[in-house]
Regions:
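General structural signal for secondary-structure boundaries
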Residues: 20, 59-62, 74, 93, ...
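Amphipathic alpha-helical binding modules
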Residues: 77-122
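Short terminal alpha-helical segments
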Residues: 2-49, 96, 114-121
Length: 122
């Protein structure tokens, strides 16, 4: 089951041409997906979350991302290690500005929707 933010990011990925923009959107989608998976009503298990973070680190490391986005995603991954809904909400709110600066307003709007939803779950 996907969230409105995930759906919007997947649509943006599908509409973008190959290149750094598409890879940035894909990386953002991966992080948003990992963060939203920590939120109630059905958060993932700690073991599953650790696996997701390991896969996330491997996948993001292989992408050609603009430096500001790469730094933001690395920081987000570190915050997600605590595996709490509060960490997920923090990560989503902190990703809005880098998403807007690097990927555009539509990507930032998708992250903003996810951040608002996360705050409602706290």
């Amino acid at each position: 089951m996907s969230t409105p933010a995930e759906d919007k990011l997947v649509t943006l990925i599908a509409d973008s041409a190959r290149g750094p923009q598409r890879e940035g959107l894909f990386a953002l989608w991966l992080v948003v997906r990992a963060a939203e998976a920590l939120l109630p009503p059905a958060p993932v298990s700690a073991k599953n979350h650790r696996r997701r973070l390991q896969a996330l680190e491997t996948r993001i490391g292989s992408l050609a991302l603009p430096a500001p986005l790469k730094r933001a995603l690395a920081a987000a991954r570190q915050h997600l290690e605590t595996a709490t809904p509060n960490a997920a909400a923090l990560v989503l709110s902190q990703l809005t500005a880098p998403a807007r600066d690097v990927l555009g307003v539509e990507a930032a709007d998708a992250v903003t929707v996810a951040a608002r939803s996360a705050r409602l779950h706290l």
